[in-house]
């Protein structure tokens, strides 16, 4: 009887280990924001919209931002890389464009997407948008 309990315990531990190992996703697989489909380390979920994404390998030190012509959003989940700014086509979505460097001395005006304080003319980047102090 005691031997049966030991075998059952070992089986239970091994089953839990394999269930955890299979519950995460690998490179190229679809992940989601609810973490019901999460990526296995070292992969991260690169979101294509607010709910879904694809497991990718990203340099942890690299900032994820968008370039000229790519679609950005007001939630700052898709930000433009400097020197590009998000030109909004509606209240939520826009396209990364290059601002005229003659306007504002090359800095970003209020309500434009930013990554750092120094990107903004006001020197204040708050929650991904420039704001006046």
Curated annotation (Swiss-Prot):
GO cellular component: extracellular region
Record's keyword annotation contains Transmembrane: no
Principal location class: secreted
The keyword Iron belongs to this UniProt entry's keyword annotation: no
Domain of life: Eukaryota
Positions of disulphide bridges: 107-121, 114-125, 120-130
Location(s) in or outside the cell: Secreted
Signal peptide: 1-21
The protein's name: Egg protein CP422
Provenance organism: Schistosoma japonicum (Blood fluke)
């Amino acid at each position: 009887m005691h031997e049966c309990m030991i075998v059952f315990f070992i089986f239970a531990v091994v089953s839990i280990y394999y269930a955890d190992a299979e519950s995460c996703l690998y490179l190229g697989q679809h992940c989601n924001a609810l973490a019901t489909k999460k990526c296995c380390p070292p992969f991260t979920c690169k979101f294509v919209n607010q709910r879904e994404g694809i497991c990718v390998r990203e340099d942890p030190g690299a900032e994820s931002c968008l370039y000229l012509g790519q679609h950005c959003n007001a939630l700052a989940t898709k930000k433009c890389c400097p020197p590009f700014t998000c030109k909004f086509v509606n209240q939520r979505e826009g396209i990364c464009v290059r601002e005229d460097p003659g306007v504002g001395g090359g800095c970003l005006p209020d309500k434009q997407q930013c990554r750092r304080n120094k990107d903004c003319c006001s020197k204040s980047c708050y929650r991904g948008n420039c704001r006046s102090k």
